[in-house]
């Protein structure tokens, strides 16, 4: 997972990409429907704590606040379901899938628990080698991650070539680099293959 329509970017994935030595070959958009799970016989009024992965919590945050329940971040959604089945406490609930409810013999206390129904997560499929594709093929996105120091006009100098060569940037995000606050890392998605003529000129600039 790389980003979600409600919770935004998945920071852990973005941090891992530059050092992974893997190539992005496809993207996949998956509609996410969260469920509020509890042990058999539990009711929402019994719940005091709701556990899930940080993305699950973020995507259901308004619902949790409205219920006035404590949020507890766990390693993943399925693991949260497993944990509450082991705790066997009516005061603990989890945000997870219907499949997790079936596997761990839990009740679904509320279906579609996410804050909005339009909840979509974008996934990247990655592998060691690039696909053999004609560089001039349309409908190709390329992802670029780069690091710059915080100096005047540095971002313009990095990205100006995209404008002058007609390459459309579809996504641009910045986040602090581990080296410190004077270094920024940028995550960029743009249209075109790295070997496309216009893209090559943009990258050379």
Regions found by a protein language model. Name each.
Residues 2-205:
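Domain-level signature for soluble enzymes in the chorismate/prephenate branch of the shikimate pathway
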